[in-house]
Amino acid sequence: MTDRSQCTQSGRTMGAQSASQDLQSLDSWLTDRIVTITVGPEEKRWVVHEKLLVSQSDFFRNYFSEGHDEMKLPDDEPRLFALFIRWLYGTAFLPSGGTRNFRFLPPDGVSVSVRDYLGVYVLGGKFGIVGVRNAVLDVLYAYYGEGSGADEHRSPDMHDITYIFEHTTPDAPMRRFLVAHALFYLFSRGRRGAPLPLDWEQVLGRSAEVGYEMIRMLGEWNWVMGANAPRMTIKARTEFHERAPLPEPEVVKQEADDEADASPI
């Protein structure tokens, strides 16, 4: 009885200490200098706590460390930057060490689309922020499912896959994730005998890189003609997470990379 009481008291103490540390971090972030960021050709303005912003990104840290009060991002979309800001403050207000993580809302095609989230993924690459890219991967992982051989499998739009190939480097996990789901759709029981969607013809007819990546991934599955295909599922979502700081933004290579990561299933 005493041991249990002591364990309970210890847990409460640790929880209180964690909460206190979280509040101290928030006080530090939310009482610091405010900076302005204008986004898009219409120059939509956001006022952001500088310390919170630079704690996540060398892209912002290097700029604001020179004493600037305002940053202009004329080539980015305000809609996507708004989603990034939602993630930035959403993660700041979640307790550290807890079981909860910030989650984007599932795409509904109206208030937010798959393409919107892919745009945020690309934006995360520009800013060098792994966390927001992983958050995008998480919401799309839930949206597309695990691909466990169901009769129906939701396929990514091929135009979305092309968008990711055009705006990311060959080692981006999102490439493998989307290609794997496209292949799971191709071999789903519900699609058997049906023609391929129009977007497949439109994209694969002009994008050798996407087609090559699909064939390369199929080769890695090691299927044997005449043998039953094994039950297959998409790897755990954390297998698609990026854990190291992203490199400085650079011109995206368009050719396929023979050294890309292994099959995601």
Predicted segments, located by residue:
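Phospho-regulated RS/SR low-complexity segments
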Residues: 9, 13, 244-246, 261
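A positional/structural detector of protein chain ends, strongest at the extreme C-terminus
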Residues: 2-4, 262-265
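Eukaryote-biased recognition of C-terminal alpha-helical segments
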Residues: 196-257
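Cytochrome P450 catalytic domain signature, combining two hallmark sequence patches
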Residues: 55-70, 93-95
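Surface-exposed beta-strand-to-loop junctions
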Residues: 36-42, 61-68, 115, 156-157
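Post-BTB helical module
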Residues: 86, 93-192
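N-terminal BTB/POZ boundary and linker segment
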Residues: 1-52, 79, 86-115, 252
